[in-house]
Design a protein with these regions (language model features):
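Long, contiguous binding/interaction regions
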Residues: 74, 82, 91, 110-113
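Basic polyanion-binding and macromolecular-assembly surfaces
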Residues: 88-94
Length: 135
């Protein structure tokens, strides 16, 4: 960014999924989270199945200070992931984990994370495939 450019804020989409019995509660808690912080959010549901559905929350953080906006951006991601897991949802659906959600994967998978680690070690003994990106 050029020094004379004005910082406009940060926008992103958070994708989560949950069973039908849990999605309503998670959705309302996510909306409440953003509304309490006066953060613009637009959410929608997609990819519905007999066992559950995915939800997207597109948010926009606009602060005068660029670093403050960046810090808030990462706090939002962490808080929404924690909230989703606490309420029994999943931190992803079909878009994968990625770098931001990576630190929450172990928490979501529990003991299954060790199995995934062992599989990666067996297939990639030299640790050259996506080093540090997933596990």
């Amino acid at each position: 960014m050029e020094k004379d450019e004005e910082f406009g804020g940060i926008s992103d989409a958070i994708e989560i999924s949950a069973s039908w019995s849990k999605i309503k509660g998670i959705y309302y808690e996510i909306e409440k989270y953003f509304n309490q912080r006066n953060i613009v959010v637009a959410s929608h549901f997609s990819h519905a199945y007999t066992h559950g559905i995915s939800s997207y929350s597109i948010f926009y953080v606009n602060r005068e200070d660029e670093q403050q906006a960046i810090d808030e951006f990462y706090k939002i991601w962490n808080d929404i992931m924690e909230l989703t897991l606490k309420m029994g949802g999943s931190i992803s659906h079909h878009h994968g984990i990625g770098m931001i959600k990576n630190k929450m994967l172990k928490k979501e998978l529990g003991p299954g994370y060790g199995m995934l680690r062992d599989l990666k070690d067996a297939v990639d003994k030299n640790n050259i495939l996506s080093r540090g990106k997933l596990i």
